[in-house]
Design a protein with these regions (language model features):
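A short glycine-rich, Lys/Arg-flanked "PGG" loop and its adjoining helix->strand segment in the class I
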Residues: 165-177
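Class I SAM-dependent methyltransferase SAM/SAH-binding core
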Residues: 84-141
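Conserved alpha-helix/loop element of class I SAM-dependent methyltransferases that forms part
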Residues: 63-81, 98
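C-terminal alpha-helical "lid/dimerization" subdomain adjacent to the S-adenosyl-L-methionine
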Residues: 41, 184-240, 248
């Protein structure tokens, strides 16, 4: 999902308790379909609109750092040749492609995104990677049975989701015991003085990026759908509340981005 600037507005994350048709609905593990909520439909529509300029928008809004952040996420996943990985909120497939390179032709990468437009672009971009499959799907109802993957990743998608706690539980559910869940997400930087400078700078840059890519209206619509980002401690607590253990945090870009890794208990 697209990198969007943090905001201090809105409620914090609360820990939880223990090429297809564009009209396709998210699948369950049994192949059945489930209808989208109005919120899901709005998010999918907004991402469909920015899909043609998604990668350029990410580069501008991250000031060119998004590639190195994805590489850090791949390293943190701990995967190797022959492993199976699920990438949720996969967008146009930049992270999925990097994961596919790591697992090789005998591995598997399942890339899931709510936006048919993103899925179409991701599938086209990775068409030469036999180990990579793109599907339209809901992060809160992943199209997989339990314990099917060696790792799960989500990059810049969590804050867009209506049910973030449910999505984190799903990521944990589909990963085998001992496997890792990797979350790469914008977080409010600390110290607060840097957070205020960063927030003001990126909020000024974001409308310019939308204009430069020819999708200002679509970007503004998407940004209006996005709720607050957590600080790093809230993100860590969200992962722990899902049942993950050994949760580790690494701050990137002076804390404006957090890379969190948790392990599914044996």
């Amino acid at each position: 999902m697209v990198y969007a600037p943090p905001s201090r507005d809105g409620p914090p994350i609360k820990p939880a308790e223990e090429e297809e048709s564009p009209g396709r609905h998210p699948r369950t593990a049994d192949g059945e379909t489930t209808s989208r909520s109005p919120g899901d439909a709005a998010i999918a529509s907004a991402f469909d609109q920015i899909a043609p300029v998604y990668d350029r928008l990410n580069r501008v809004l991250s000031l060119g750092r998004d590639g190195r952040w994805r590489r850090a996420a791949v390293e943190a996943s701990g995967i190797g040749p022959g492993d199976a990985v699920i990438d949720v909120a996969a967008g146009t497939g930049k992270l999925a492609g990097a994961l596919a390179d790591r697992v090789g032709p005998f591995g598997r990468v399942l890339a899931v995104d709510l936006s048919p437009g993103m899925v179409a672009r991701g599938a086209a971009a990775t068409s030469d990677l036999v180990q990579c499959e793109f599907v339209v799907g809901d992060a809160a109802l992943l199209p997989s049975e339990d314990d099917q993957f060696d790792a799960a990743t989500i990059a810049f998608g969590l804050r867009v989701l209506p049910d973030r706690a449910g999505a984190m539980r799903e990521l944990r559910r589909v990963v085998r015991p001992g496997g890792r869940v990797v979350c790469l997400e914008p977080t409010m930087p600390r110290p607060r003085w840097w957070g205020r400078i960063y927030e003001a700078s990126v909020h000024r840059l974001a409308p310019l990026a939308g204009t430069a890519t020819g999708r200002r209206d679509a970007y503004n619509r998407l940004h209006a759908l996005v709720t607050t980002v957590p600080d790093a401690n809230e993100l860590i607590e969200l992962m722990r509340a899902s049942g993950l253990v050994e949760v580790r945090h690494r701050g990137l870009w002076l804390g404006a981005v957090s890379l969190c890794v948790g392990t599914v208990p044996a």
